[in-house]
Each structure stands twice: as structure tokens, then as C-alpha cells.
């Protein structure tokens, strides 16, 4: 059974934060290719002159001690991330995030960037080529970094930067193929085959798979986008 686990510490905190806990469910739908919505990125080949400076795009919110989300091998395709915003043209150089631990062998994550038009309730993937990150087995917290394989410019606007669980060891996937039949003892014995991310109290989006739409949630995973801002 697919699971998106948020530990009880966060659940308690969200119960106290009524303004967050009572936030209505919001779903964004993918913009069609002929959509007139202003959701776009700038062309790769454009060269920008004038003032520029190094900058980080981050909108993490409050880190809640002990709060984390866990993915297991049956969560392939699931996404979670952070929303960032730029007021000027921005060239992405790297994207970083923390992993608390990982027990899944040969785990591969990919990063996509979705331009958001929250007024029209739409989003659009602006990347031609996703960024991939191979995650080693980890017993302690580690920062991971992904780099674009091509020039990536963002127009002024809001973006959902998402991490997706893409692939893992074939034998591990086979082990998890019948997990709906497991009893509690079996599930507990397999629980080490999971990856854990820290969570921050600031709204973002998630979705269970590429065929699903983005759904707003009151937490994010604290991604940081580093690059060059042009003015």
C-alpha cells in the first residue's frame, strides 16, 4: 500500500496551527500545450547583459524538529518539493536538498521545475531534460545537489521545484511488488528500505504519480535553488 508518512510530531503541530490545518485542499491541473496561461521559461540561447549577482531562491519556512516524510520503493513516481519565487530573470546553477537517511539500494531521484499560475490553477513543466541524483545508502543526514545539464533560465514568477522518486534496484522493486499482502511483522522488517526527508512548515505541492495533478499541502522539503539573478 502506498504511503506518504508524516511523523506524529508534525501532525500534533498542525493540529495546533488552525490556520494551516484548516487550509482547504487545492489542486492544480497541468496546462495544455495550447494553453494561453502565462506559464513559461526563457529560451536557453538568450544571452543577458547588465547587472547580475549570485542568489539563492529558498522559501523553506520553519523547520519542525523530528518532522519528516518517508518514501518506500512502492512510492515510485511520487513528488514533493518546495515553492520558490524570482522577481527577475534567474539562471539556475544547482539545486540542493537534505536527506535524513536512505536504505534503498540504487535509488535514483529526478528534479523537475514547474511554473505555477495559481490564479488559473495551472502548472507546466519547464524543463526539457530532468536533473537526476543517485542517492547512496545513508545512515545520517546528507545534503544532495543536482546540476542542470543545459542552461536553465527562469522568467519572473513562482515555481514548484519537485523531487520525484524515479527508480531503484530491480530486486528491491520485486520484493515490494506484493507489499499489499504483507502482515505488520513483514512490513516492519522491510521498513528500513526507505528514504527520509526533513519537512518545513510552509505550503507547497505534492502528487502521487505523473498521471495525477498537483495537490497543495502545508509542508515542503526545504529545497534551495542557487544561481545568477539578472537585473
Explain the meaning of each model-derived region.
Residues 115-123:
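Short aromatic-acidic-glycine turn motif
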Residues 1-25:
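Bacterial Sec-dependent N-terminal signal peptides
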Residues 148-150, 156-159:
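Secretory N-termini
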